[in-house]
């Protein structure tokens, strides 16, 4: 019996889309849309994420919340919010974004105008298929200071991917071994957590990870 092909993320690219047309499309799709949108000066890409995509994003968020809790840092997890700069003609929609401040006031909607609101401190992108647009050029234009990009594949090895952490420096992204926001946290430790969550379960993996953070803090005091 022939093996059923694995599902894959679908990306649709539309050229020649004006900003006004893009805004009209946003209104038509509504705030409960499932597609991830990327827009770069007339080119629009729409991608519908698979469940594996969302699973990775949720696991990384659970890790991020533990880090903030242990470091006693206020964190605002705003999910997959659309980040816009109309003056630049740029829009990106990371899988998750985080503000590490209690002072920020966010509008109650599924998009942020970065001319009115500062960009999130950390953005997370899960990459299963490659975008046809230069997303990092868009992230740089939007001024996102730190981006985590988790590359993986569909199937049993979805939690055995590769995490790349980037910091914006002079308009360009530079790869870092550790998170610039949390210097004690290397990308490889995040990968270990993802692997452990698959092997021993999320609750136990979070307990192990929390203990590890506490050890790192004690070493630096």
Regions found by a protein language model. Name each.
Residues 1-221:
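Gly/Pro/Ser/Thr-rich low-complexity, intrinsically disordered segments predominantly at protein N-termini
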